[in-house]
Amino acid sequence: MNKSSMFFHMLKPFKQVTITTRQLSKESMCNDTAIEYCANIVKQYDYENFMATLLMTKALRSPALVLRAFNVEVARVQDQTSDAQTAEFRLQFWLDTLKTIYKKEQSIKNIPANPIAQELFKICKSYGLQKRQLDKLITSRSELMRTKHFKTLNDVEKYAEDSVSPIYYLLLSVAGVSNVHADHAASHLGKAQGITNILRSVRVSSYHKIVTMPMDMLMKHNVSQEEVLRSTDSENMRSVAFEIASRANSHLLMARSIDVPSISKQIFLPAISVDHYLTKLQKLNFNLFHNSLLLSSATLPFSLYYNRVLKKY
């Protein structure tokens, strides 16, 4: 069973939508079109999470697409411009938008004419989502843009907690789950996925002349920043990758070991993608720069579907 056949019936509702600035200003834009826009953003820039989201129940799927589209927009800011001030302005737009959304007795007419912002307003009001979790998705990216590196592996872990875990906390709120064990699992999964994202971004970050691998690990294994920027494979580099991947895997195992409410398991389905990457990296003896890591996994769609049916993650 291939990727396209398995997900074809789910992909059909999300037609490719291109929305111009003029179109965004129209108050008549229907809810379905806005959701399609969010879905296309996630599909284009966060495909693995998009596939996992399609396997969620209908009631959770649309809010999940909105939250992930918001996260994509925030995460992409640093890739869209090399000018730090412009990037900060774009992040400030979203911080200001959140302030507007959370004003008492707010009307959608006062929300910026942006489909993601308007859909975010709707789900925040419908589900009483915590503003601080949405704020974290922005401020974590803003802080990284200023520092441009991580001093320690613990700093990477904190960044992962702040830039990924909030999505899971918010989705649990949408699902009506108020459970300390589910929150604990969400924290560990966010850390696992966030740390893995750092590993996966090493090549891209190197292209932008940024070293995202923690300095303490590089120093411990005698790897220079220049070696990272040149994508130099070596035993020492693999030792760095091994330690970082081990931390991610430890959090993944913790997330999976916790007994959580049944509905939470579909929310935590991206754990399968994290496991796939870490397993592949291990088979490559932790060579971060192997070209096969750039290829999508042919078995991932089946694994997501299989684990969804079994209610596992």
PLM-predicted stretches and their roles:
Residues 2-14, 18-142, 160-172, 182-195, ...:
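Catalytic cores of Mg2+-dependent Asp-rich isoprenoid enzymes
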Residues 156:
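Conserved donor sugar-nucleotide recognition element shared by glycan-biosynthetic enzymes
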Residues 145-153:
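Cytochrome P450 catalytic-domain "roof"
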